[in-house]
A protein has these predicted regions:
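Rossmann-fold NAD(P)H-dependent dehydrogenase/reductase core
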Residues: 3, 22-251, 329-343
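Active-site rim elements
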Residues: 200-208, 266-272, 306-312
């Protein structure tokens, strides 16, 4: 009996050790960089929850002033309440931001300029995924929120960065799963009404396309800033696969999903990152010396990684041309010259 108990305890101990080792491997590295952010102004979209909130908290600890652009005021207020350090809380501010509303984005930028002058870092962190096909001003909502809204926001801020500015776009490594033929169909003139998405709407494919667009935005805008001699570097960051409710909230609609979610829980605990670890690569790109940051580059697990063919500038130019066409077709930015100039 004693022997059986010892064997059982040994097995349990071994499983726990393996679980911990695998979990630590899945979490990826912590950034080994720290940098004083005193007097730095950082704007982050979707900074009130998940990896955005952890990014916000770390930046505050380093001395930055952080403006969270969020759509949900209740969630933003909860985020502010979660910051216990009074000194840090005094440097954190919430402003309403709806990335599918050009007028709101414009007023958001103008208010920040009037209150803070120029900014140092823009983190395009916000992301959404809509289960059902939905249009907003003629544009599919996931694409509008995750990409087009951030494109508009970035363009409106371009002239209002302090020297050595940074734009950080959060994307996903799943961008690699998009075939060039799929991108060509998506960016064709026949898809200006998003008809490609209407039939057999695949919300995951649409989400991945919107994140590929973030990679393309970094490539295109980084190249534009270099050519125009604008002192800004633009990068993409894959935060990792995060064990939070982002996708589970979208699909929580059936007993099938509940069972699948329950069965996947051990795998997520082992292989997915928590929110703190998910923020590390974004923070790495905030704290890295500006000269070492690769303009247009893609970062994963606190390291630079070469883009695959689908993410390169040649394909980025196709997608940005598509963006221009849908913006003009739907009169999204009312002919705003600050935005339209990047398409020339």
């Amino acid at each position: 009996m004693f022997f059986e108990i010892c064997v059982a305890l040994f097995v349990i101990f071994t499983i726990l050790v393996l679980f911990t080792l695998i979990s630590n491997w899945g979490n990826g590295p912590l950034t080994d960089l720290t940098h004083s952010m005193k007097d730095k102004i950082v704007v982050i979209t979707g900074g009130s929850r998940g990896i955005g909130l952890e990014t916000t908290k770390d930046l505050l600890r380093q001395g930055a002033t952080v403006i969270m652009g969020c759509r949900d005021s209740n969630q933003a207020n909860k985020a502010l309440e979660s910051i216990s350090n009074l000194s840090q809380k005094s440097r954190c501010f919430y402003m309403h931001l709806d990335l599918t509303d050009y007028e709101n984005i414009k007023s958001f930028v103008e208010e920040i300029k009037s209150k803070y002058g120029k900014i140092d870092i823009l983190i395009n962190n916000a992301g959404s995924c809509f289960r059902n096909f939905t249009l907003s001003d003629g544009i599919e909502l996931t694409y509008f929120t995750n990409h087009l809204g951030h494109l508009i926001l970035s363009c409106l801020f371009l002239d209002d960065f302090n020297p050595k500015g940074r734009i950080i776009n959060l994307v996903t490594t799943k961008y690699k799963r998009v075939w060039e033929s799929t991108l060509d169909k998506f960016t064709s003139n026949s898809n200006l009404d998003f008809s490609y998405n209407r039939k057999g709407y695949d919300w995951m494919k649409t989400y991945i396309l919107s994140k590929l667009a973030g990679v393309h935005l970094s490539q295109y805008l980084g190249d534009y800033c270099t050519n125009q001699k604008i002192d800004i570097k633009v990068v993409s960051v894959h935060p990792g696969f995060i064990n939070n409710h982002f996708f589970r909230d979208i699909e929580k609609h059936s007993i099938y999903w509940f069972i699948r979610d329950f069965c996947q829980t051990p795998y997520r605990w082992c292989m997915f990152k928590d929110n703190v670890m998910g923020a590390q690569t974004t923070l790495h790109c905030c704290y890295m010396e500006w000269e070492q940051l690769s303009n247009g580059g893609y970062y994963r697990d606190c390291h630079y990684e070469q883009l695959t063919h689908i993410g390169l500038l040649k394909n980025a130019q196709k997608l940005i041309a598509f963006d221009k066409a849908i913006i003009e077709k739907n009169n999204i930015v009312k002919g705003d010259k600050k935005i339209m100039q990047i398409f020339k």
